[in-house]
Amino acid sequence: MITNPGEINLDDSLRICQETLKKGRAEGFMPLTVTVIDVAGVIRATLSEDGSGLIRAKIAYAKAWTCLAFGVSTNKLRDIFEDQPRLDKAIAGMQTMADGNLVPTPGGLIIQKNGKNIGSIGVTGDRSDQD
């Protein structure tokens, strides 16, 4: 349970990361990296399992950032982009404006409390459809 409805605190962020890693291990996923950020894009927690690749923390952050930037999960965003093939040039432009943080692949979810966005989570390490 989120303890402060206006923000996501460190304890909640760590718990979310730990629970995500626990679920990944139970499902037999490859080593995961999980990042939780607040609505300002500030990293509240990042945890990487042993064997997780060097770039995974950046990817997890970018997935979380992408959710907040567009207000939807990265799964939904991927579907939107796939349905609009002409968006390729726009995506390239947005990637530049986003300092490389635009990652519209599954693994990012918005965290809400009482219908209000308070942060997001990015997960990477396994196949995108399992992140």
Language-model regions, residue ranges each:
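Flexible, solvent-exposed loop/hinge segments and secondary-structure transition points
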Residues: M1-D131
